[in-house]
Amino acid sequence: MTLGYLYSKFFKRVLRGNSILNSVIAKTAKVYSGSTFYDSKLGRYSYVGYDSEVINCEIGAFCSIANGFITGGAKHPLDWVSTSPVFYNVGSGTGHHLGNLPIEKTAKTIIGNDVCIGSRAIIMQGVNVGTGAAIGAGAVVTKDVPPYAVVAGCPAKIIKYRFNDDIINKLLKSQWWLMDDKILKSIARYVNTPELFLSELEKIKSNVGGGKYKELNASRFFFFATSNSYCDRRMAA
């Protein structure tokens, strides 16, 4: 845990800002106040609600994350004599150290595209959440979540899938979340009917020939946030 991270916690709690550090945020994405967003990425049109803590996590496009979400927190060594961080080489909760033992870095959490996460849900570090999944409020997710699965509970379990296998496979194959805004605007009225949406999408792909519809150049949609103030710069290609 670095000095910058500890500063970001102070900024969030005392000044009620949204503390963003060493992260990449899409220009059309948003992290709400009271939240810590550290060593992470947030895709276009995604948002993270108030009072959330996101550490070492990659979040795709079009994700809706409610207030109080937590992922990527510190992992304490359960097989050591003590779980206290005063004995290893990260920031200590007390500000004091009795040792400097190395400890394995927390695994990165991956959240796909168009994922919906309910209020105060927790996703354990290193978990992969598939595109289109929905996480219930207060859920504790300890295992990978398949695409378009709906999970809830503690520990979270699969309740159902949002669509049948055919629709899920077609949506995943379409990768609609990579499309240019102009294309998405032209078919936005079909979002509430998956079959029509996919049908119209196929027409668009056919009209431009060979299915080579325009996809996004990610460098157009991101800026770096390397401190508590935004820095409007494009990503390297």
List each language-model region with its residue ranges.
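Conserved G/P- and acidic residue-centered "switch" motifs that form tight phosphate/ATP-binding loops
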Residues: I135, G153
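Flexible, glycine/small-residue-enriched loop-and-beta-strand segment within the central core
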Residues: F10, V14-L15, K30, F37-G43, ...
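Conserved catalytic segment of ABC-fold P-loop ATPases
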Residues: G130-A133, P146-Y148
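Conserved catalytic-core motifs of eukaryotic protein kinase domains, centered on the activation segment
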Residues: K75-P77, V145, Y161-R162
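C-terminal segments of enzyme domains that contribute to small-molecule binding surfaces
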Residues: V14, S84-I123, P155-A237
